[in-house]
Curated annotation (Swiss-Prot):
This is CMP-sialic acid transporter 3. The chain crosses the membrane at residues 40-60, 74-94, 143-163, 171-191, 200-220, 244-264, 281-301, 322-342. Residues 389-405 have a biased composition (Basic and acidic residues). One of its GO terms (cellular component) is Golgi apparatus. It comes from Arabidopsis thaliana. It is found in: Golgi apparatus membrane. Keywords: Golgi apparatus, Membrane, Sugar transport, Transmembrane, Transmembrane helix, Transport. One of its GO terms (biological process) is sialic acid transport. Sugar transporter involved in the transport of CMP-sialic acid from the cytoplasm into the Golgi.
């Protein structure tokens, strides 16, 4: 076996080894057989993600009154999780009604209990997301919406490191250089002095901003990678059932946060609807739609694509914040965005793929060509074709994602 490709001793054809850990099939192998309809769907998902992610900082900014929030950010996160739970239940009911005869019922108690046990790892990203969602509001106290989006792009580098460690994904030198370009683009946008003064919580602005930035980058990066790992490790489980567990855990953690606020501030803070406005209602719907869309990225695509998709939303955020709130679009911002787009093009370029990935895809296509030629010969000799088919009964299912073991 070489580079994850095994050679059949009987016919010397190339086959993907089910034990290979170099490249995850969830990332690469499915892209070879992507249909035109799925490509269109992926484009629509990216466009929708850009709009939702780009609109979120604007809605958060609109929710502030005199630079402060009259509502509890935890209450917004809790209502968002409740909205996503309702969506998951509705979609699960619809999926159950369209099940074929003989399939294991999705709504049976045994199926639910078994799926809950298999997907208990989703509690980890749910907790991290609960922390991150609160940090999104805190970051708005330090930066304008466009800057928040630029800072969030720092997550890509942290995610890449975590993917290499957790998912065993390999990146080429060109892809690492693309990530470095991304950091340069973000830095160019930040080449201006921070305003002086103190924040509402009494911490010097520079210190508070740096601390929040480190947490704001690290926590959601870990949440995204662990979420992707948990979703892909139970690939055969319905995504709506997995989302039900993920959002259920999230609602529990946010409710515990509300109880903690009640203990700290008193019973008056238990009113989760206090201080909400029309802008916060749109914010809740936007956050819910964004979370639902993210789950499809994590299960059927990958986290890097999701984060680069969110990067494109920076343009929308910058233009919207300038039009609605009068924020100035600086030359640094335009230069930073240009560098970010160059980075994105370089990262996803076919020439930037890791050498092992190129060899695997080339060997896989060569193996498929040999198999096709051999199948044509077996049409003449049916007995030989039957023997050859029997020799490959052990090949793994292409639908099963290859995760580190």
């Amino acid at each position: 076996m070489k580079n994850g490709i095994a050679e059949c001793p009987a016919c010397h054809s190339k086959l993907v080894s089910p034990g290979s850990k170099t490249i995850s099939r969830a990332y690469d192998d499915h892209k070879i057989r992507v249909s035109s309809k799925q490509r269109v769907l992926n484009v629509l998902l990216v466009v929708g993600d850009c709009m939702l992610v780009g609109l979120q900082p604007v809605l958060v900014y609109m929710s502030k009154v005199d630079g402060k929030f009259n509502f509890s950010p935890i209450s917004v996160n809790f209502l968002t999780e409740i909205a996503k739970v309702i969506f998951a239940i509705v979609m699960l009911l619809i999926q159950a009604r369209h099940q074929k005869v003989g399939e294991k019922p999705l709504l049976s108690v045994s199926t639910f209990v078994q799926a809950a046990r298999n997907n208990v790892l989703l509690a980890v990203p749910a907790l991290l997301y609960a922390i991150n969602n609160y940090l999104k509001f805190t970051m708005q106290l330090y930066f304008n919406p466009a800057t928040v989006k630029m800072l969030s792009n720092l997550k890509v580098l942290v995610i890449a490191v975590l993917l290499k460690m957790v998912m065993k994904r390999r990146f080429s030198i060109i892809q690492w250089e693309a990530l470095a370009l991304l950091l340069i683009g973000i830095s160019v946008n930040q080449l201006r002095s921070l305003p002086e003064g103190a924040t509402a919580i009494g911490i010097p602005l520079a210190t508070g901003a740096y601390v929040c930035t480190v947490i704001f980058v690290t926590v959601p990066s870990m949440a995204s990678v662990f979420n992707e790992y948990a979703l892909k490790s139970q690939y055969d489980t319905s995504i709506y059932l997995q989302n039900l567990f993920l959002y259920g855990y999230g609602a529990i953690f946010n409710f515990l946060g509300i109880l903690g606020t009640v203990i700290y501030k008193g019973p008056g803070s238990f009113d989760i609807l206090q201080g909400h406005s029309r802008a916060t209602m749109f914010l809740i719907l936007n956050n819910a739609a964004q979370g639902i869309l993210s789950s499809f990225f994590f299960k059927y695509a990958d986290t890097i694509l999701k984060k680069y998709s969110s990067t494109v939303a920076t343009i929308f955020t910058g233009i919207a914040s300038a039009a609605l709130f009068g924020h100035v679009i600086t030359m640094n911002f335009l230069l930073g965005i240009s560098i970010v787009f160059i980075s994105m093009h370089q990262f996803f370029s076919p020439l930037a793929k890791a050498r092992d990935e190129q060899q695997q895809n080339g060997n896989l296509e060569l193996g498929n060509t040999k198999d096709t030629h051999r199948a044509n010969e077996s049409f003449i000799n049916m007995a030989a074709g039957a023997n050859e088919e029997a020799s490959h009964r052990g090949e793994s299912d292409d639908r099963t994602p290859l995760l580190p073991r």
